Amino acid sequence: MKTRIHVVQGDITKLAVDVIVNVTNPSLMGGGGVDGAIHRAAGPALLDACLKVRQQQGDCPTGHAVITLAGDLPAKAVVHTVGPVWRGGEQNEDQLLQDAYLNSLRLVAANSYTSVAFPAISTGVYGYPRAAAAEIAVKTVSEFITRHALPEQVYFVCYDEENAHLYERLLTQQGDE
């Protein structure tokens, strides 16, 4: 797994990967944080694609994921997932966060994409504690790629150095980095 999982500090919208994962709200209509940055970088085609998905299936439930084209992003596609809002840890948040990663990975693999970039799901305005979220992310992704050929490369994209070090430390502890 050492060569399959990477930590990158920077702007997820600039990565040349097959799929960028967008953390969105159930409406898929764009918002603040990473969601807003991805929508701005992708241009109006992404919002149009999200509107079509929403018209077909309605809101995207927490822990679920959908895939669309990537608009003006360097990626080929965007997987939109709804992470859980942190409510103290007693509202099934851990399982919902794991589901957000798993369902995103399943869409990447099902569409034969080889690389994916994840932001730190739910750690922004949704308030999930960073360390707990990183542990779930690393464990879930590591277990998935152990059992599946795709994606070949997974990137955890961290906005700041502190979060990047957190992911690097967890991967080192697992022997993955």
Curated annotation (Swiss-Prot):
Statement: the UniProt record of this protein carries the keyword Hydrolase: yes
Q: Give the main EC class.
A: hydrolase
Q: Name one GO molecular function term.
A: ribonuclease inhibitor activity
Q: Give residues annotated as binding substrate.
A: D11, I12, N25, G33, V34, D35, S122, T123, G124, V125, Y126
Q: Quote the catalytic activity from the record.
A: 3''-O-acetyl-ADP-D-ribose + H2O = ADP-D-ribose + acetate + H(+); 2''-O-acetyl-ADP-D-ribose + H2O = ADP-D-ribose + acetate + H(+)
**What Enzyme Commission number(s) does the record list for this chain?**
3.1.1.106
Q: Give yes or no: UniProt keyword Hydrolase.
A: yes
- Active-site residues annotated for this sequence: D35 (proton acceptor)
Boundaries of every Macro domain copy: 1-175
Q: Which GO terms describe its biological process?
A: purine nucleoside metabolic process
Mind telling me which SMART domains this protein's record contains? A1pp
An example Pfam family from this entry, by short name, is Macro
Family in the record: Belongs to the MacroD-type family. YmdB subfamily.
What's the subunit arrangement here?
A: Homodimer. Interacts with RNase III.
Question: In UniProt terms, what function does this protein have?
Answer: Deacetylates O-acetyl-ADP ribose to yield ADP-ribose and free acetate. Down-regulates ribonuclease 3 (RNase III) activity. Acts by interacting directly with the region of the ribonuclease that is required for dimerization/activation.
Indicate what this protein is called per its UniProt record. O-acetyl-ADP-ribose deacetylase
Its taxonomic path starts at: Bacteria, Pseudomonadati, Pseudomonadota, Gammaproteobacteria, Enterobacterales
